[in-house]
Amino acid sequence: MKAINIHYLPVFMLLFSTSCFAQKNEKAVQQSSFFTKTDAENWVYVLKDKTVAASDVFKMDEGILQITGISSGYLRTKKSYTDFELVTEWRWTKTVGNSGVLVHIQPNDTVWPQCYQVQQKASDAGDIICMNGLWAKECTDSVKFTVKKMQPSNEKPLGEWNLIKVISKNKTLKVFVNGVLQNNITGLTASSGFIGFQNEGKPLEFRNLSIKILNKN
């Protein structure tokens, strides 16, 4: 009996260790739900026209964020993020226009903030703009702070949902549009900050937002 116990002890320890490792990783990539009515209070709203009510521009219900296009500005998380994977869908509802996912937004909210803008402008989705003094290795004067997407535009027609994924990891940003890797910038001068969604005057919607916190390694 002792021999049998000794024989199975390493197997037991391996299973226990594997289980703990899986639980640790599962916790590290836990998803969160957004854009419900109760979620509206978890965001900071920044508008160029201070006379406009944020509730007239940004509307949340049943997991969908509606941006009406009034004035210009953005909403951002109250929480700061460093290494993460963001996935969301967006579509233009009346006519195509300009918008973006803002990542690593720095404090002192203004229109426009220090951040990296992942473009959603029609025909340019996947470009990355280094805004107001933030830099990356690829954001040079010669490209005028805009790192163009790698592949031809692959956005869907007006009214159809597009999928965008942004991965922030170890001072790099990767951007996928509808499953295609469109950008990869490195050497970020800001590797943490708030996450936001831009309003630039045209109605659009976002849905199915998830943000996974990634392990540091």
Regions found by a protein language model. Name each.
Residues 1-27:
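Bacterial Sec-dependent N-terminal signal peptides
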